[in-house]
Regions:
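N-terminal subdomain of nucleotide-sugar transferases
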Residues: 1-61, 107, 249
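Acceptor-binding helix/loop patch of EC 2.4 sugar-transfer enzymes
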Residues: 8, 74-87, 135-171, 229
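Donor nucleotide-sugar binding/catalytic pocket of nucleotide-sugar-dependent glycosyltransferases
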Residues: 162-166, 170-214
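Acidic donor-binding loop of glycosyltransferase active sites
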Residues: 181, 286-303, 314-317
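Conserved catalytic-core segment of nucleotide-activated headgroup transferases in glycan assembly
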Residues: 205-290
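Short hydrophobic beta-strand element within catalytic cores of glycosyltransferases
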Residues: 307-310, 317-320
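Conserved acidic donor-binding segment of nucleotide-sugar-dependent glycosyltransferases
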Residues: 334-341, 348-355
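A charged, aromatic-enriched C-terminal amphipathic alpha-helix characteristic of glycosyltransferases
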Residues: 352-385
Length: 388
């Protein structure tokens, strides 16, 4: 048996939650000790640099990248429009990668793990191989994100465009999910959504594995922070809510309170009115353990929030929303707020009590250790591979 791992962007550097999820999958696939080839697209936003991949990873598998121009264009949109396909997916079609897949040796059983629906354009050529079985790993139900965008915008042109993109994407998602040999959703929420689409393909939830962390957060700290890539609209909206609606109210009661905002694709800005923009943080573990209370008023999106899981693994006290906690099983140590007023109140309770910060943080940490163990996740993957 051999493995072919396809990604729509380089795994390294791990600049966002998607890369983090792919890094975890790559490490799991290598842990199976099955010979592995890794094909990745390189885009304008996510260029390829071989040296960003750790040396031990490069030594354990064959890595090849293919340049893709994915920045949306009017010409590209109308070409896709008249061809009747999804522009969201068509942008990731590269002839060189298709040829490489077509020529990939299939003289022995081959498992292909495809990251996200954005690589669905390669399914037809993959299915021509007699010995290949395709597993699609779903990070989100992508068409649902575009429906949410359509519902959120007040611009009638954007509403029409987003609805059109969602409908085209939904058709191709259903087709791809139906043609795959197996689906690997990250969460039970997405697994249920796939079933509701009428998909009969076997679906096995493969959560994001997290290494156990021995250290815990510093519970003497009661300042606030948010971390997330700022090229993702739900994170942009959450930061705006924090800065404009939640933090100013808290600042009245706690004049010396600070809010740190961190994440890739954001600029550093000096402390102003208690808010500091840190940009990308190189030592995530240290940042999580030393920054206080994670506040994440996420109001849109689907799939699991990788940064929340990472913070939970470090025992960080967290306040978020039902959408922010989507995909994470219940009784997880997260504090869920239902309104902006409730969000502010829950933060107030944590600011006031070190014991509460410790109790909720340690509950979250224990939850992650129980449900997201790499050994448990690896066992599930190997079992599913053996079935094919």
């Amino acid at each position: 048996m051999q493995l072919l791992y396809l990604t729509n962007k380089p795994v390294y550097p791990t600049v966002d939650g998607g890369c983090k999820a792919m890094q975890a999958m790559l490490e799991l696939l290598l842990a199976t000790e099955i010979p592995l080839t890794h094909f990745t697209l390189a885009t304008e936003k996510h260029p390829f640099n071989n040296t960003e991949y750790p040396k031990d990873i490069r030594e354990k598998c064959t890595i090849k990248h293919f340049e893709a121009k994915t920045i949306p264009t009017i010409i590209g949109f109308f070409k896709s429009f008249f061809q009747g396909n999804s522009y969201n997916i068509a942008r990731f079609h590269v002839s060189e990668l298709e040829r490489a897949i077509s020529n990939f040796p299939d003289d022995e059983p081959t498992i292909v793990v495809m990251e996200s629906i954005f690589l669905a354009a390669y399914l037809p050529v993959l299915k021509k191989h007699k010995n290949i079985r395709v597993f699609i790993r779903t990070h989100n139900i992508e068409h649902e994100l575009w429906i949410q965008k359509s519902e959120a915008t007040k611009n009638p042109f954007k509403k029409l465009l987003f609805t059109f993109l969602a409908n085209r994407l939904k058709i191709e998602e259903i087709t791809a999910f139906s043609e795959a040999d197996e689906l690997f959703p990250l969460t039970t929420t997405d697994a249920d959504a796939i079933k509701e689409l009428g998909i009969t393909t076997n679906s096995t939830v493969i959560p994001m594995p997290l290494q156990p962390i021995t250290e815990s957060a510093d519970y003497t700290k009661n300042d606030l922070f948010f971390i997330g890539a700022m090229n993702w609209q739900p994170n942009i909206e959450a930061v705006a809510t924090l800065k404009e609606e939640i933090f100013p109210n808290l600042k009245v009661q706690h004049p010396f309170l600070t809010l740190k905002l961190a994440g890739s694709f954001s600029k550093k800005e000096a402390l102003s009115n208690g808010v500091e923009h840190l940009g990308f943080v190189s030592d995530l573990g240290l940042f999580l353990q030393s920054s206080g209370i994670l506040v994440a008023p996420i109001s849109s999106g689907s799939g699991v929030r990788i940064k929340l899981l990472e913070a939970m693994s470090h025992g960080v006290p967290i306040v978020t929303t039902e959408i922010g906690a989507m995909g994470i099983p219940k009784n997880n140590g997260l504090i869920i707020a239902t309104t902006l007023e409730d969000f502010t109140d829950q933060i107030q309770h944590l600011i006031a009590s070190e014991e509460l910060r410790k109790t909720t943080g340690q509950l979250a940490k224990a939850f992650v250790q129980q449900h997201y163990s790499p050994t448990t996740v690896l066992t599930k993957i190997i079992e599913r591979f053996k079935q094919h």
